[in-house]
């Protein structure tokens, strides 16, 4: 949608008027001087209404007008998308009303059966009772739906004419300053429609019209959101930047279900225009967008491009302002380093296609400080740092082994799949680096794992690409102890008597720690798989 406007502005002189909003004084003084001097009358200055607005020059006024027109364009496009989505919902309601007009009215017997099954609802407008009562309530419902349909059509037509009306209006440039008004259908809670000029004189008539015109959504679909509506909200939050930091007013308890969650999401994204959009259009929100964002308490991944840029700027050879890991992030030196990095990052990103907010830039700097802090702590205790690094490596390998085994579990029977359903990564083997042969991984199964699950893991490894690698051999059981979560697993997965079984095995004979034939003690009935593995190892060596 394109706009073109010609703005004539002549600021009054200092002797005539001190404020550009005093149009009356400027006009009278300019008219008197024009009539006396014979010069052509000067252009009437444009008056701008707003809260705390003081225009000092014509360039500033043009800039403000451009910002508000651009903001109105984005809101109008998003409003048109919302109106179209609401119109689709209204069509579905009109189809149901059409079926009722054709004579599909509940009979008295059906009403008695429905009353016996379910309690009578409290919402008015539902067809219950005798046929006479149903026939009396049917015309009222038809009139209600007709008024809703006409109201939605008026909204759509006004939104389509919104762009062209921006060059027609001669009034002041006011944006979303009207008080909020509510209009709700009986038996359903709908959002309010806030009156706003929107550069359109027809909007004032729309706000002053009857409440039936303001009804946009219908009760049957008030708790749903169409994909088009979600797309319109996302476009509004992306196109309208953080120009205003106003917060939305708190919704009342009898308000729309999920509207508070949607408004808070728009506020957190920094889109002030989107917040005004939800207030001005009376949009009925739903928490489905929040539920679809991912798992609860999931770890947010950092932007790799931004993290790499922070790393390069901080570790540049010419940079002498670097983080001090021995101090807190709130120390004066580290705060100065963060400010320095923010300035350098903004300079680097001026010609970059990536657009990052100040909050994202600061978060990347703090994340890199935590990395330096961790390096400093590990340097104080090298053994602890190496131990944590080794544990992290083994845990990562267990996760990878668990994912590899789970990917081929669909080829096994239903009994094995049922057993694998409650398996966690803690029950996987520790794939340690061999001390004798570089590049060889020694798989050491946990001692607390049940024998049945151990046999299933051997079968999975024999049928997987990862398990049949030549550089992967089996070793003695691991010394890792079970966690509290592992001790709650069923006996098919967790062996609670693993320490007693280990003691009994030591009485019979010591377990051989050799890596050449370690399988015969842990899984003696799977020698066929082990022999194939040993042949591959001897062939490669």
Curated annotation (Swiss-Prot):
Phosphoserine carried by residues: 226, 286, 429
Q: Which UniProt keywords apply?
A: Isopeptide bond, Phosphoprotein, Secreted, Signal, Ubl conjugation
Instruction: Mark out the compositionally biased spans (Polar residues).
Output: 232-243
Its GO biological process annotations read: cell differentiation; positive regulation of gene expression
Instruction: Locate the Phosphothreonine modifications and list their residues.
Output: 118
- Taxonomically, the superkingdom here is Eukaryota
> Which residues fall in a coiled-coil region?
none
Protein biosynthesis among keywords? no
Q: Name one Pfam family in it.
A: DUF4616
Q: What is its main location?
A: secreted
Q: Where in the cell is it found?
A: Secreted
Secretion signal: which residues?
Answer: 1-17
Mind telling me where the Glycyl lysine isopeptide (Lys-Gly) (interchain with G-Cter in SUMO2) cross-link is? 128, 223
| UniProt feature, compositional bias: Basic and acidic residues | 103-116
Q: Which GO terms describe its cellular component?
A: extracellular region
Q: Does the keyword Cytoplasm apply?
A: no
Q: Where is this region: Disordered?
A: 28-47, 103-138, 232-254, 494-526
**PANTHER family annotated for this entry?**
SIMILAR TO RIKEN CDNA 4931414P19
Name of the protein in its database record = Uncharacterized protein C14orf93 homolog
**Native species of this protein?**
Mus musculus (Mouse)
């Amino acid at each position: 949608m394109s706009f073109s406007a010609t703005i004539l502005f002549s600021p009054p002189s200092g002797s005539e008027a001190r404020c550009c909003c005093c149009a009356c004084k400027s006009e009278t003084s300019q008219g008197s001087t024009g009539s006396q001097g014979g010069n052509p009358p000067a252009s009437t200055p444009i008056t701008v209404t707003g809260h705390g607005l003081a225009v000092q020059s014509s360039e500033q006024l043009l800039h403000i007008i451009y910002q508000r027109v651009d903001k109105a364009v984005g809101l109008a496009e998003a409003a048109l998308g919302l109106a179209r989505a609401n119109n689709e919902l209204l069509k579905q309601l009109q189809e149901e009303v059409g079926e009722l007009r054709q004579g599909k009215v509940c009979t008295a017997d059906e009403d008695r059966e429905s009353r016996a099954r379910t309690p009578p609802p409290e919402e008015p407008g539902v067809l219950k009772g005798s046929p006479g009562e149903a026939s009396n309530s049917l015309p009222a419902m038809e009139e209600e739906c007709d008024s809703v349909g006409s109201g939605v059509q008026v909204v759509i037509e006004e939104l389509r004419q919104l762009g062209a009306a921006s060059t027609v209006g001669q009034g002041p440039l006011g944006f979303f300053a009207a008080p909020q008004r509510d209009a709700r259908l009986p038996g359903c809670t709908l959002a309010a429609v806030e009156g706003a000029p929107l550069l359109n004189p027809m909007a004032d008539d729309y706000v002053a019209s009857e409440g039936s015109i303001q009804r946009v959504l219908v009760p049957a679909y008030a708790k749903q959101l169409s994909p088009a509506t979600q797309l319109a909200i996302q476009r509004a939050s992306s196109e309208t930047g953080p120009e205003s930091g106003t917060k939305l007013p708190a919704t009342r308890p009898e308000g729309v279900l999920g509207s508070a969650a949607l408004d808070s999401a728009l506020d957190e994204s920094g889109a002030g225009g989107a917040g005004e959009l939800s207030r001005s259009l009376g949009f009925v929100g739903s928490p489905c967008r929040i539920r679809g964002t991912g798992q609860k308490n999931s770890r947010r991944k950092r932007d790799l491009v931004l993290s790499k840029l922070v790393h390069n700027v901080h570790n540049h050879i010419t940079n002498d302002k670097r983080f001090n890991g021995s101090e807190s992030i709130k120390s004066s030196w580290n705060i100065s380093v963060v400010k320095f990095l923010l300035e350098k990052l903004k300079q680097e990103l001026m010609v970059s296609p990536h657009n990052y907010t100040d909050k994202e830039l600061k978060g990347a700097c703090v994340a890199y400080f935590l990395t330096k802090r961790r390096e400093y702590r590990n340097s104080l205790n090298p053994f602890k740092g190496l131990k944590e690094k080794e544990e992290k490596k083994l845990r990562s390998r267990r996760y990878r082994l668990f994912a590899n085994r789970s990917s081929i579990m669909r080829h096994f029977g239903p009994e094995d799949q049922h057993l694998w359903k409650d398996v966690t990564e803690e029950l996987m083997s520790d794939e340690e680096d061999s001390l004798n042969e570089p590049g060889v991984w020694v798989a050491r199964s946990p001692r607390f794992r049940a024998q049945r699950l151990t046999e299933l893991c051997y079968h999975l490894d024999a049928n997987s690409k990862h398990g049949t690698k030549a550089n992967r051999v089996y070793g003695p059981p691991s010394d890792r102890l079970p966690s509290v979560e592992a001790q709650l697993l069923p006996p098919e997965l967790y062996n609670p008597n693993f320490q007693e079984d280990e003691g009994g095995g030591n009485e019979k004979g010591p377990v051989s720690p050799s890596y050449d034939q370690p399988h015969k003690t842990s899984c003696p009935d799977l020698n066929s798989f082990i022999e194939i593995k040993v042949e591959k190892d001897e062939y490669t060596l």
